[in-house]
């Protein structure tokens, strides 16, 4: 793995912009997935990718928010993963190139996700056709966008899919969990540096002290059905587990899949890992199920609520 050493270096100079530029530019060399097309669209304050597998219909659509610690990642880094979801779920995908720290606050990224949701509604998609999804920091954004919709009097989506999600910006529990030492992708030092940088950005942009609000601390009642996937060797395993418990307590239909031996956002390695391809198929099945439910009906449970997967 080369990601963990690179993040370890970044932890010592977290305000540097090189990481975002290098990662996104390097990802431009990744070949497109066969049978999938994409085109650039413009949202209010950022761009997005409109991704469609050649077999995709207009029955369902995924609003996708990429990971990258709110600092890096983008349309290039996550195009193949978003394309696989489109292909597997027979769905279109709107992948949002949301604004990043340190120039922008996390709240700006949430606003960009909301703009993506409005874009879909404006083009005639029913909320019962829309699933909001994200990985890592994008998982945080997926929940925060969904929570914001009710405050804006916007209809809730059909479902949420969170892959290796960050759901608690407080790093304390994660750093104390055994998974922090086992994770081959995220070093503890990077998590500590990200927390400190987030606090500085919040103070500079909003004039407030402390971290932004976390999904695990929210009133989750009324959220649509949720699928959580995480690897057993993922630094963010505790976040996925805690979010599962919070959603269960709130009465939200939720399924948690823990993939044994897998690392942070292992889905991006679908070209090499059969487990990643299986996980994406589970995501696709969830999308198909929740988007076929009619308005006012209860969604069937497509997966066991909590299970380990070898």
What are these language model-derived features?
Residues 74-75, 81, 94-129, 270-276:
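Catalytic nucleophile-loop/oxyanion-hole region of alpha/beta-hydrolase
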Residues 69, 98-105, 167, 263:
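Alpha/beta-hydrolase active-site loop signature
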Residues 134, 138, 142:
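Gly/Ala-rich beta-loop-alpha elbow adjacent to hydrolase catalytic centers
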Residues 61, 90-94:
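A fold-wide structural signal in alpha/beta-hydrolase
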Residues 59-69:
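Short beta-strand element of the alpha/beta-hydrolase
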Residues 1-56, 204, 292-310:
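A glycine/proline-hinged amphipathic helix-loop "lid/cap" segment
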Residues 143-310:
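Alpha/beta hydrolase fold serine-hydrolase catalytic domain that processes acyl esters and thioesters
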Residues 53-61, 221-223:
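Proline/glycine-enriched tight loop/beta-turn segments at coil->beta junctions
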């Amino acid at each position: 793995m080369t990601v963990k050493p690179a993040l370890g270096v970044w932890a010592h100079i977290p305000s540097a912009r090189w990481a975002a530029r290098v990662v996104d530019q390097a990802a431009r060399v990744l070949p497109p997935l066969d049978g999938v097309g994409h085109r650039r669209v413009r949202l209010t304050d950022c761009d997005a990718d409109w991704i469609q597998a050649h077999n995709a219909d207009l029955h369902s659509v995924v609003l996708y928010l990429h990971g990258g610690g709110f600092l890096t990642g983008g349309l290039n880094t996550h195009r193949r993963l978003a394309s696989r979801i489109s292909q597997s779920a027979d769905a279109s995908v709107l992948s949002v190139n949301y604004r990043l720290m340190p120039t922008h606050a996390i709240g700006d990224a949430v606003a960009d996700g909301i703009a993506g949701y409005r874009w879909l509604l404006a083009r005639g998609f029913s909320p019962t056709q829309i699933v909001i999804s994200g990985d890592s920091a994008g998982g945080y954004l997926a929940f925060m966008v969904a929570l914001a919709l009710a405050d804006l009097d916007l209809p809730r989506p059909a479902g949420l899919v969170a892959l290796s999600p960050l759901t608690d910006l407080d790093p304390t529990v994660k750093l104390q969990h055994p998974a922090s030492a086992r994770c081959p992708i995220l070093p503890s030092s990077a998590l500590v540096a990200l927390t400190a940088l987030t606090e500085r950005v919040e103070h500079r942009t909003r004039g407030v002290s402390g971290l932004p609000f976390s999904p695990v601390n929210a009133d989750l009642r009324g959220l649509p059905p949720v699928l959580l996937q995480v690897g057993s060797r993922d630094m963010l395993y505790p976040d996925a587990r805690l979010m599962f418990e919070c959603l269960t307590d709130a009465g939200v239909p939720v399924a948690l899949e823990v993939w044994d031996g897998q690392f942070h956002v292992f889905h991006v390695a679908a070209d090499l890992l059969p487990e990643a391809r299986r996980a994406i198929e589970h995501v696709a099945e969830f999308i198909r199920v929740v988007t076929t439910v009619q308005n006012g009906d209860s969604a069937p449970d497509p997966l066991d609520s909590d299970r380990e997967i070898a």
